[in-house]
């Protein structure tokens, strides 16, 4: 019987093991005390399994169109059918996001535990693989405890270095490199954004619905909309997370990107001006105080400061230039992102093994025959909304079927 190792008990590794069990004797090596640690925290504990609308435009990397070949082999419909077959019906919620009907990540992990046992998969916890050696007859794996195990095929599903609280590390990249693969330098994606602006820090804790964009080299490279959370170091919330990958990529490339925030996306500039002019009818009011009815506490003073206006300036003394600057700040607040925040805070990591080194029909390495690489180890990362888990399910299922 074919001996198959799966390195990593995350999303792609678990589904790979389920399919591979039909083709041989499978052992899953997981360095943590429990499988599915990152699944447990996905979707804020609800497990955003996939998305109703999957296309290459929601993926990034050197060659994002790689996903088209992957999803042609095992796509969202195949994924939903698989989950239904193991007792996890799926429901669709906001923006096409798909979740287990239980709305609990823990139920997904429990079902996988049951399925692996039912299919005869040997799950070995607290087993960190430190080396892969290729030989004439397959692969020899060595654990951190110096145990050695021989296999005919290996599915490398160790995940990225993002989100250390769930046990993430760089070992997957190191193992891939040791077999001859190149690794594009990872960087954190989908996480809060540092903004080196002390005035902005005074808005810590405030949430506000905005339109946001990222500009680099004179063009808009990313857009988002939704809730923005001001923090003690910058910005977070869905509107920030959605542009964080582009922000970090351009910061690291030293392209001096700029984040633009529209605090009133539902109003045109002229409509906002008309609203403000009505609020400025009392010439004796301080200009910051005049905004108290349309902005949350602390926002008027900070926005005035960012616009270069003394918050105590009376309306009567605020000329056209000052008013124009304030309106511009409210409709086009321009912020310079700082260095990326740490991998420990990131949902995913961009970068990884170049996909031109992988056969999308099987996920087998083009460099090391018998080695399969899946999920976030590859140089493909998706937007928030179930796109990354879908890529993990698809690549894992393909590898498990092909091994």
Protein language model regions, located:
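Short hydrophobic core segments
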Residues: 5-7, 29, 129, 149-165, ...
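An anion/pyrophosphate-binding glycine-rich loop and adjacent beta-alpha core
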Residues: 33-35, 40-41, 49-56, 89, ...
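Glycine-rich FAD pyrophosphate-binding loop
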Residues: 5, 21-44
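Glycine-rich loop(s) and the adjacent beta-strand/alpha-helix scaffold that form part
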Residues: 153-199
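A conserved short coil-to-beta-strand element within the FAD-binding core of flavoproteins
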Residues: 125-138
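Beta1/beta-strand and adjacent pyrophosphate-binding region of the FAD-binding site
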Residues: 1-12
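Glycine-rich active-site loop/strand segments that organize a redox cofactor
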Residues: 46-92
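A glycine-rich dinucleotide-binding beta-alpha-beta segment and adjacent secondary-structure elements
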Residues: 125, 301-381
């Amino acid at each position: 019987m074919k001996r198959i190792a799966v390195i990593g008990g995350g999303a792609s590794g678990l589904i790979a093991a389920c399919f591979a069990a039909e083709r041989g004797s499978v052992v899953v090596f997981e360095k943590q005390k429990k499988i599915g640690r990152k699944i447990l925290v996905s979707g804020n504990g609800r497990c955003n399994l996939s998305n109703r609308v999957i296309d290459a435009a929601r993926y990034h990397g050197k060659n994002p169109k790689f996903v088209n070949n992957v999803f042609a082999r095992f796509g969202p419909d195949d994924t939903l059918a698989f989950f239904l077959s193991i007792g996890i019906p799926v429901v669709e919620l906001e923006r096409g996001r798909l979740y287990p009907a239980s709305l609990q990540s823990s139920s997904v992990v429990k079902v996988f535990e049951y399925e692996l046992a039912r299919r005869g998969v040997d799950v070995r916890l607290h087993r960190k693989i430190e080396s892969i050696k290729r030989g004439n007859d397959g692969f020899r794996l060595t654990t951190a405890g110096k145990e050695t195990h021989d296999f005919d095929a290996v599915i490398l599903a160790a995940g990225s270095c993002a989100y250390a609280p769930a046990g993430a590390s760089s070992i997957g990249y190191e193992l891939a490199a040791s077999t001859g693969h190149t690794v594009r330098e990872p960087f954190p994606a989908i996480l809060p954004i540092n903004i080196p602006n002390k005035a902005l820090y005074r808005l810590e804790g405030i949430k506000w619905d905005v339109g946001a964009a990222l500009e680099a080299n004179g063009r808009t490279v990313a857009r988002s909309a939704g809730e923005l959370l001001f923090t003690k170091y910058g910005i977070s919330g869905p509107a920030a997370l959605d542009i964080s990958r582009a922000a970090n990529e351009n910061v690291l490339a030293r392209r001096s990107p700029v984040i633009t925030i529209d605090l009133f996306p539902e109003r045109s500039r002229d409509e906002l001006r008309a609203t403000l002019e009505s609020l400025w009818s009392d010439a004796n009011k301080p200009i910051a105080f005049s905004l108290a009815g349309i902005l949350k506490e602390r926002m008027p003073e900070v926005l005035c400061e960012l616009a270069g206006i003394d918050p105590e300036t009376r309306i009567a003394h605020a000329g056209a230039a000052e008013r124009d600057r304030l309106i511009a700040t409210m409709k086009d607040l321009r912020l310079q992102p700082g260095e990326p925040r740490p991998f420990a805070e990131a949902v995913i990591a961009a970068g990884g093994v170049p996909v031109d080194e992988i056969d999308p029909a099987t996920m087998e390495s083009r460099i090391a025959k018998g080695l399969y690489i899946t999920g976030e180890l590859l140089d493909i990362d998706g937007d928030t909304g179930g796109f990354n888990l879908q890529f993990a399910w698809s690549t894992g299922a393909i590898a498990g079927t092909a091994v």
